Amino acid sequence: MAGNCSWEAHSTNQNKMCPGMSEARELYSRGFLTIEQIATLPPPAVTNYIFLLLCLCGLVGNGLVLWFFGFSIKRTPFSIYFLHLASADGMYLFSKAVIALLNMGTFLGSFPDYIRRVSRIVGLCTFFTGVSLLPAISIERCVSVIFPTWYWRRRPKRLSAGVCALLWMLSFLVTSIHNYFCMFLGHEAPGTVCRNMDIALGILLFFLFCPLMVLPCLALILHVECRARRRQRSAKLNHVVLAIVSVFLVSSIYLGIDWFLFWVFQIPAPFPEYVTDLCICINSSAKPIVYFLAGRDKSQRLWEPLRVVFQRALRDGAEPGDAASSTPNTVTMEMQCPSGNAS
């Protein structure tokens, strides 16, 4: 079927399955972690439909997050992070949806190849932007909870917007260099350049971003446990941060195993690339569900507006009845922050 012939992750088999495809098409389909696979058969044709359905659901969810966090809910330092995170996830899902649509039909030729190439570039850039935002969220949340007084007194007013802008530019720069050597130059580039770029991106992802998001979360868990022993409720925002980091770590297990086995031990990856892509799409689609589950009130049997649910998910600081707590109410501190902390 056409969907099998045009699957992006199996460039090594495309010329065999579809003789009309050029070598340039094989280069354009290359992306991060396109490595040698144990399984050489193309994925089932139904995979494209699963991708499309999952991406559409994720686009709806992230679109709601963008609307409510951007226009209906008062801006807070952490809502700005979640706003940019939803933007990155939405763009990633859109790029995957476009590729899935092209794979479902008989779209061959230079223009569909160009669309696939642009979609992969956008997907790689937004994927790294979303991943790089998680350490920033984890670190800032950990500092704001453990050292609240110092944090809110020393924190620059536009820190969230500045960090997000810096991470977007960093992701664009890194992925531009990677795509230049691995996609545009192709065989004209030195043989080891693209390989070194893949290794560098993997090190950046697994040995820098992951520890920077895990260690603050561990400190946050210890702090939450201490509060639980003192019978103090933890802020819902803590649950949101821990949940989105956990979802990413679980969904990136296959990606990490493939990368580690291939680049460290030169062992062909046991998991096909469409499986790792599917896990990343699940990660990008799951965050709105995390906000909803964290913000819903179990005591409310009737339907609540989504704006109220999302706003409750961002609840920070001491709950009612914790007035005696020595931890300052960071809700009040956030309300005192100027609303100009825009993205």
UniProtKB/Swiss-Prot annotation:
The chain crosses the membrane at residues 45-66, 83-104, 124-144, 161-181, 199-220, 242-263, 274-294. Pfam families: 7tm_1 (PF00001). Glycans are attached at N4. Residues 324-343 have a biased composition (Polar residues). Residues 67-82, 145-160, 221-241, 295-343 are cytoplasmic. Residues 1-44, 105-123, 182-198, 264-273 are extracellular. One of its GO terms (molecular function) is G protein-coupled receptor activity. InterPro entries: GPCR_Rhodpsn, GPCR_Rhodpsn_7TM, MRGPCRF, MRGPCRFAMILY. Its main location: membrane. SUPFAM superfamilies: Family A G protein-coupled receptor-like. Residues 318-343 are annotated as: Disordered. It is a multi-pass membrane protein. One of its GO terms (cellular component) is nuclear membrane. It is found in: Cell membrane. Keywords: Cell membrane, G-protein coupled receptor, Glycoprotein, Membrane, Receptor, Transducer, Transmembrane, Transmembrane helix. Belongs to the G-protein coupled receptor 1 family. Mas subfamily. Orphan receptor. May bind to a neuropeptide and may regulate nociceptor function and/or development, including the sensation or modulation of pain. This is Mas-related G-protein coupled receptor member F. It comes from Mus musculus (Mouse).
